[in-house]
């Protein structure tokens, strides 16, 4: 008997119209922070993951296909058609 397990994608899509978006801007766009200053602190404290790894660079460029995780929620960067 063959068992196939598929990971359910529960990510929240964030559509962008540009080539990339900076991590702190993506956090503001997703309404997970109120200001860039708040995003800066959370990122520098290591509370944000990009593509499954802790990221402390607030200027990190996220492109379509990238994800960031904060407070248990996963946000997927997608390209607006």
Model-derived regions: residue spans:
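Ferredoxin-like alpha/beta domains used as RNA- or RNAP-binding modules
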Residues: 1-30, 54-81
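Short, well-ordered loop/turn sites that connect or cap secondary structure elements
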Residues: 33, 42-43, 62
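Generic non-transmembrane alpha-helix signal with a bias for helix starts/N-cap capping motifs
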Residues: 20, 35-36
């Amino acid at each position: 008997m063959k068992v196939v397990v598929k990971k359910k994608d529960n990510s929240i899509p964030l559509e962008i119209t540009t080539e990339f978006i900076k991590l702190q801007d993506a956090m503001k766009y997703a309404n997970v922070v109120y200001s860039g200053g708040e995003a800066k602190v959370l990122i520098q404290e290591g509370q944000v993951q990009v593509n499954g790894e802790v990221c402390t660079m607030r200027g990190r460029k996220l492109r379509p296909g990238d994800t960031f995780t904060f407070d248990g929620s996963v946000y997927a960067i997608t390209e607006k058609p």
